[in-house]
Amino acid sequence: MKLVVGLGNPGEEYARTRHNVGFVVADRLAQLAGASFTAKKFAAELAEARLGPERVWILKPQTYMNHSGEAVGAALRFWKLGLDDLVVVHDDLELEPFRVQLKVGGGHGGHNGVKSVNAHVGSPEYARVRVGVGRPPPRMDPADYVLGKFAKGEDAELDLCVEQAVEATRLAVELGAAKAMNQVNRRSRAAE
């Protein structure tokens, strides 16, 4: 069994914001798997699905970004899962917009949701699907930038990016992060 976590903030006011791209990917992954978010546990919405041979719980913390790790840590402990069973999808300021990259471990890059997950699972050594949102314009607060909505003209790019992130997540679940990284990151570089 695997746990896939989409990071975001609950509430309609955060829909379509850069910071909520993890929720968008989680929603699309559940939709493609024929699952829906009907369960509520660990202060999160949950959907049970199958990705290939793997049973997967897709989790969207409802604690707001800075406390996302509470739900993730509770779910890992409840199902007795290890860090190699965890895939977290989140926005990333350090990646150019609409670029998808898979990595294991590393720093949180100032992302408070990732920082919270690291603290509550005890390590950064888990798979992360990073979805690039780019850097804010000069003199703009990064918090305001990530809480800003994608422009209407970015819909096609966002949709394609979400599909790429869903595929990266699926590969991480089915193949394991190490094998999946080669495929995902090679595709991401080729798209440049």
Curated annotation (Swiss-Prot):
GO terms for biological process: protein quality control for misfolded or incompletely synthesized proteins; rescue of stalled ribosome. The gene is pth. It catalyses: an N-acyl-L-alpha-aminoacyl-tRNA + H2O = an N-acyl-L-amino acid + a tRNA + H(+). It is an enzyme of class 3 (hydrolase). The keyword tRNA-binding applies. This is Peptidyl-tRNA hydrolase. GO terms for cellular component: cytoplasm. PANTHER family: PEPTIDYL-TRNA HYDROLASE. It comes from Anaeromyxobacter dehalogenans (strain 2CP-C). Keywords: Cytoplasm, Hydrolase, RNA-binding, tRNA-binding. CDD domains: PTH.
